[in-house]
């Protein structure tokens, strides 16, 4: 893998992982347009570590407060808004973790295609538009509730289908529950921490069991690029979200879906 490929793919991962526009829809473009081959387990792992580090550092105070409060709740010190949020994040992770563990091979066998990505990019983009247009926007992430967290968690299962966008579908679900745009986005980003961590652990296990040779030097460049681009993306997205809403991302998804259909029809 050339340094150009590493830079481009790391930028795509970092810039699209937390925006509601589907990272898989963008990662398919280099292979379709430039003929780039699959980057391999080690590269997937290193990019996940980069984006995981970004969200952990950006939300470090929230993570510290939730962790302390969660441990306190286990010790019988009572509930706080941080301990409740921590429990909701954990509960919301279970559906995708279970279904992903048992159904990942089925998804990769039957749903990992360019046309599936084009369809899901378009359809779930329209669903995001509908949810944003009809959202009450009266709750923060601390008012999600257990039922709401589970609803968002089951919505996250749909992100196993390539092109759906994990952040997109979970923000959509949050808006449906009446969360503010910022609250839905923050809950989505916080719940990405355990799911990305588990995906990284899974990739690490597969890598350990494989005999893949890796030149780690260039890959750490990819980790750094995905980290910096992801943390900047989170920051700018949360600042602009209430100003611009979801419509720019919806329009972008529709254009991207149409473009994917176009290039796939020519292959």
From Swiss-Prot:
<dbReference type="GO" id="GO:0009252">
    <property type="term" value="P:peptidoglycan biosynthetic process"/>
</dbReference>
<feature type="transmembrane region" description="Helical">
    <location>
        <begin position="113"/>
        <end position="133"/>
    </location>
</feature>
<keyword id="KW-0046">Antibiotic resistance</keyword>
<comment type="similarity">
    <text>Belongs to the UppP family.</text>
</comment>
<keyword id="KW-0961">Cell wall biogenesis/degradation</keyword>
<dbReference type="GO" id="GO:0046677">
    <property type="term" value="P:response to antibiotic"/>
</dbReference>
<dbReference type="Pfam" id="PF02673">
    <property type="entry name" value="BacA"/>
</dbReference>
<feature type="transmembrane region" description="Helical">
    <location>
        <begin position="1"/>
        <end position="21"/>
    </location>
</feature>
<keyword id="KW-0812">Transmembrane</keyword>
<keyword id="KW-0573">Peptidoglycan synthesis</keyword>
<dbReference type="GO" id="GO:0008360">
    <property type="term" value="P:regulation of cell shape"/>
</dbReference>
<dbReference type="GO" id="GO:0005886">
    <property type="term" value="C:plasma membrane"/>
</dbReference>
<keyword id="KW-0997">Cell inner membrane</keyword>
<feature type="transmembrane region" description="Helical">
    <location>
        <begin position="219"/>
        <end position="239"/>
    </location>
</feature>
<keyword id="KW-0378">Hydrolase</keyword>
<keyword id="KW-1003">Cell membrane</keyword>
<feature type="transmembrane region" description="Helical">
    <location>
        <begin position="39"/>
        <end position="59"/>
    </location>
</feature>
<dbReference type="InterPro" id="IPR003824">
    <property type="entry name" value="UppP"/>
</dbReference>
<keyword id="KW-0472">Membrane</keyword>
<dbReference type="GO" id="GO:0050380">
    <property type="term" value="F:undecaprenyl-diphosphatase activity"/>
</dbReference>
<comment type="function">
    <text>Catalyzes the dephosphorylation of undecaprenyl diphosphate (UPP). Confers resistance to bacitracin.</text>
</comment>
<protein>
    <recommendedName>
        <fullName>Undecaprenyl-diphosphatase</fullName>
        <ecNumber>3.6.1.27</ecNumber>
    </recommendedName>
</protein>
<feature type="transmembrane region" description="Helical">
    <location>
        <begin position="244"/>
        <end position="264"/>
    </location>
</feature>
<keyword id="KW-1133">Transmembrane helix</keyword>
<keyword id="KW-0133">Cell shape</keyword>
<feature type="transmembrane region" description="Helical">
    <location>
        <begin position="87"/>
        <end position="107"/>
    </location>
</feature>
<dbReference type="GO" id="GO:0071555">
    <property type="term" value="P:cell wall organization"/>
</dbReference>
<feature type="transmembrane region" description="Helical">
    <location>
        <begin position="189"/>
        <end position="209"/>
    </location>
</feature>
<feature type="transmembrane region" description="Helical">
    <location>
        <begin position="144"/>
        <end position="164"/>
    </location>
</feature>
């Amino acid at each position: 893998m050339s340094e150009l490929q590493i830079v481009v793919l790391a930028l795509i991962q970092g810039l699209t992982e937390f925006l509601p526009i589907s990272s898989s829809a963008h990662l398919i473009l280099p292979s379709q347009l430039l003929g780039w081959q699959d980057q391999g387990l080690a590269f997937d792992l290193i990019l996940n570590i980069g984006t995981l580090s970004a969200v952990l550092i950006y939300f470090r105070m929230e993570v510290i407060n939730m962790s302390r409060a969660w441990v306190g709740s286990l010790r019988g010190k009572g509930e706080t808004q941080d301990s409740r949020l921590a429990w909701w994040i954990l509960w919301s992770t279970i559906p995708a973790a279970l279904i992903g563990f048992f159904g990942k091979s089925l998804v990769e066998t039957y749903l990992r295609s360019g046309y599936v990505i084009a369809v899901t990019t378009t359809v779930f983009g329209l669903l995001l538009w509908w949810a944003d247009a009809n959202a009450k926007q009266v709750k923060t992430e601390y008012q999600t509730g257990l039922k709401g967290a589970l609803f968002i968690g089951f919505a996250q299962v749909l992100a196993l289908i390539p092109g759906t966008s994990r952040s997109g579908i979970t923000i959509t679900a949050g808006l449906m529950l009446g969360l503010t745009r910022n609250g839905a986005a923050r809950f989505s980003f916080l719940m990405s921490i355990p799911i990305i961590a588990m995906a990284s652990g899974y990739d690490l296990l597969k890598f350990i069991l494989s005999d893949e040779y890796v030149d780690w030097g260039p890959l750490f460049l990819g980790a750094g690029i995905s980290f910096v681009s992801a943390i900047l993306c989170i920051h700018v997205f949360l600042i602009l979200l209430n100003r611009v809403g979801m419509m720019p991302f919806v329009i972008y998804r529709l254009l991207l879906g149409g473009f994917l259909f176009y290039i796939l029809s020519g292959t």
